[in-house]
Amino acid sequence: MGIDRRPLAIAVMGPTASGKTATAIALAKQLDGEIVSVDSALVYRHLDIGSAKPDAAERAQAPHHLLDLRDPWQTYSAAEFAADAGRVVADIVARGKTPILAGGTGLYFRALLQGLSPMPEADPVMREALSTEAAERGWAALHAELAKVDPAAAARIHATDPQRIQRALEVYRLTGTPISEWQRRPGVAPLPVRTLKLILAPRDRAVLHQRIEARFDAMLAQGFLDEVRALRAMPEMAAVTAPLDLPAVRAVGYRQAWEYLDGEGDAARFRDKAIFATRQLAKRQLTWLRGELDARWFDPHVDGERLAGAVSTFVAR
């Protein structure tokens, strides 16, 4: 087998609250690299505290890319991300640096490392119709409908993942072709890099749950609710007829905060709902990550030396 001469990239993957930001910064310093965010919440301006977006001190330690690309009332597709990330990675490589792809959005990672099928663009009218149906029937009913027209997609998409249910049904209703079929068609090519996939996750699930809870309490102390109040006060957000359908507001924590500020439940109930939703997100992320068969798993708080050794070995190849 010949030598793989493609440029090197490091993918730092993992569930929420697993330590990806700190690890990515450490690797960027070790490899003279630059960090490319692979996170669907971090593309939105004004979503800082609740998204755990790297702060000014963290950004000062290494260059960061693909943060703050859109306003919260706008949308941003996986195809747009793949195009933007492709340009950024090409520029990083051209300057002799190492791209550090860091985040927890599985669709974005698949778009980068496996390519993206040429699916139709989002249709606001269809999305609004699906949201109205969900309000009347519930997302579980729409998931059951998806299972009838696209069993393969329904098997991959959890019944509590409204954004992906909506997208799958949107594509089917617009084209008459299941999204699983679209995903098999050639489209955007994967990045022309050789990639070391690192998955960060505590060995003990209870430890991850504790970190999620502690981090959310820290976000509350930092002013997360005030951040959401400021979002709600923006004229552009106030003009949106169904703000809970916006991808930015659907982000874990933001949706629960929005509902709380709408008068749903008390502060304790809001906290419990947000922490539960974050744990469910972590569960879905771990399910996706277990399918990454060519990845290396590490507990960043235990396996620091082993992780550094794996990176050094890969780079030296």
Curated annotation (Swiss-Prot):
Keywords: ATP-binding, Magnesium, Nucleotide-binding, Transferase, tRNA processing. Substrate binds at T16, A17, S18, G19, K20, T21. ATP binds at G14, P15, T16, A17, S18, G19, K20, T21. Pfam families: IPPT (PF01715). InterPro entries: Dimethylallyltransferase, IPT, P-loop_NTPase. It catalyses: adenosine(37) in tRNA + dimethylallyl diphosphate = N(6)-dimethylallyladenosine(37) in tRNA + diphosphate. Residues 39-42, 163-167 are annotated as: Interaction with substrate tRNA. GO terms for molecular function: ATP binding; tRNA dimethylallyltransferase activity. Belongs to the IPP transferase family. Monomer. This is tRNA dimethylallyltransferase. It comes from Stenotrophomonas maltophilia (strain K279a). The gene is miaA.
